[in-house]
């Protein structure tokens, strides 16, 4: 999107998801770039000496700003302590070409069995993912029977929709 302000030139706004980890941002970045193709860690800055500011107490050496990309999508993250927790109100959707791809991402990203439902899963860092076929809209167009199939699934099984 482009935004114009009085006295300023037109600029493009870039939206970048920001992830607040307790104290394992570097581990998470390394993990995610191993899961998704065309991914990399771009930059990591660490908290300075904790004596510089009262907010840095106990944070020296942890990630202050991590920048990484997953299959071309930029993310930023930090170690911010246990103040905030991830929940299902925000999730990332991975669209897959086929059942094999769904299975691959599911095996890498689903670590909380009780969170598995309708293609949703939660990884070991608490982030929610939706692992879905890229043609889910077509599969769901089959009506109430498709909804019933989806509601019974944890990992989506494409064949169960095709057999309706």
Report each predicted region and the residues it spans.
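Vicinal oxygen chelate
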Residues: 21, 25, 35, 70-74, ...
């Amino acid at each position: 999107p482009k935004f114009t302000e009085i006295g300023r030139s037109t600029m493009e706004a870039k939206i970048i998801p920001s992830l607040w980890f307790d104290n394992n941002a570097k581990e998470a970045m390394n993990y995610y770039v191993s899961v998704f193709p065309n991914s990399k860690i771009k930059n990591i800055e660490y908290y300075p000496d904790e004596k510089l500011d009262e907010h840095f107490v106990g944070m020296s050496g942890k990630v202050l700003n991590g920048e990484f990309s997953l299959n071309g999508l930029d993310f930023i993250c930090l170690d911010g302590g246990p103040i905030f927790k991830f929940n299902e109100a925000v999730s990332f959707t991975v669209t897959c070409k086929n059942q094999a791809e769904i299975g691959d991402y599911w095996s890498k990203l689903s670590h909380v069995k009780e969170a598995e439902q309708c293609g949703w899963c939660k990884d070991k860092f608490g982030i929610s993912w939706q692992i879905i076929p890229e043609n889910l809209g077509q599969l769901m167009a089959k009506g109430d029977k498709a909804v019933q199939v989806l509601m019974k699934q944890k990992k989506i099984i494409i064949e169960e929709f095709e057999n309706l």
